[in-house]
Amino acid sequence: DQNTSDMMMNNGFKSLQFSGNIAVIKTRPGYASSIAYDIDNRDFKDIIGTIAGDDTIMLVLREDVDQRIIRNFLSFIIPE
């Protein structure tokens, strides 16, 4: 599976950080809403929902979900 530095090489993606049951994705300006749209349309049970601005996405995660599961899922949304 793809790690964060691999995803960073993809167009639009800059970083991913976790705090409790929240994840924050930073993107280049203008990319956040399209990435959030792709995340939301996968109906992934461990991500309750997203809120996107111009260059930031907040993901609300299911309680106690393993960060590795989220990173793995995101590697399919944000491929190399």
What is the meaning of each model-derived region?
Residues Q2-R71:
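Non-DNA-binding regulatory cores of transcription-related proteins
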Residues I70-E80:
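Short, charged, intrinsically disordered terminal tails
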